[in-house]
Amino acid sequence: MGRVRTKTVKKAARVIIEKYYTRLGNDFHTNKRVCEEIAIIPSKNLRNKIAGYVTHLMKRIQRGPVRGISIKLQEEERERRDNYVPEVSALDQEIIEVDPDTKEMLKLLDFGSLSNLQVTQPTVGMNFKTPRGAV
């Protein structure tokens, strides 16, 4: 079992990453020097632990978003994804095939006026109510 990191190490590393993300990388030694320059860390041991956790978090950030850390670049990326508008709307197709239940739901949602809806009978799927052992 590995060592447990204290909340001091974790909080310090998160704050350092949020403020100085552009100066940090995947290399422990460069991160150690950056931590030494930007923060007053009382001991060498604590500095090394913080730099190690910063390096660990930087590797995780490259794979995807990390909980508890908000970086401007990630915020902008998330914003762009949320505001995405497709080139062609799903409703702009010539004919949209729907089953009768879906047609009723669309009518209740005031989408009954869509002219390109074509009601089709649902295809019968597998019958799951056969007794076990019957072939």
From Swiss-Prot:
For this protein, the record's SUPFAM superfamilies field holds: Rps17e-like
Q: Where is this cross-link: Glycyl lysine isopeptide (Lys-Gly) (interchain with G-Cter in SUMO1)?
A: K103
Q: Where is this cross-link: Glycyl lysine isopeptide (Lys-Gly) (interchain with G-Cter in SUMO2)?
A: K103
Gene3D superfamilies noted in UniProt:
Ribosomal protein S17e-like (1.10.60.20)
Where does it localize?
Cytoplasm; Nucleus, Nucleolus
Phosphothreonine found at: T130
Q: Can the keyword Ubl conjugation be found in this entry's annotation?
A: yes
The highest taxon in the source lineage is Eukaryota
Residues carrying N6-succinyllysine: K19
Query: Which key words tag this protein in UniProt?
Result: Cytoplasm, Isopeptide bond, Nucleus, Phosphoprotein, Ribonucleoprotein, Ribosomal protein, Ubl conjugation
Chain positions found as Phosphoserine? S113
Looking at the keywords, is Phosphoprotein present?
Answer: yes
What PTMs does it carry? Ubiquitinated at Lys-103 by RNF14 and RNF25 in response to ribosome collisions (ribosome stalling).
GO terms under cellular component: cytoplasmic side of rough endoplasmic reticulum membrane; cytosolic ribosome; cytosolic small ribosomal subunit; nucleolus; small-subunit processome; synapse
GO MF annotation terms: structural constituent of ribosome
Q: Which Gene Ontology BP annotations are present?
A: erythrocyte homeostasis; ribosomal small subunit biogenesis; rRNA processing; translation
Which HAMAP family is this protein grouped with?
A: Ribosomal_eS17 (MF_00511)
UniProt-listed NCBIfam families:
PRK01151.1
Which family would the database say this protein is a member of? Belongs to the eukaryotic ribosomal protein eS17 family.
Subunit structure of this chain's protein: Component of the small ribosomal subunit. Part of the small subunit (SSU) processome, composed of more than 70 proteins and the RNA chaperone small nucleolar RNA (snoRNA) U3.
Q: Describe the task this protein carries out.
A: Component of the small ribosomal subunit. The ribosome is a large ribonucleoprotein complex responsible for the synthesis of proteins in the cell. Part of the small subunit (SSU) processome, first precursor of the small eukaryotic ribosomal subunit. During the assembly of the SSU processome in the nucleolus, many ribosome biogenesis factors, an RNA chaperone and ribosomal proteins associate with the nascent pre-rRNA and work in concert to generate RNA folding, modifications, rearrangements and cleavage as well as targeted degradation of pre-ribosomal RNA by the RNA exosome.
Q: What is this protein called?
A: Small ribosomal subunit protein eS17
Q: Which organism is it from?
A: Rattus norvegicus (Rat)
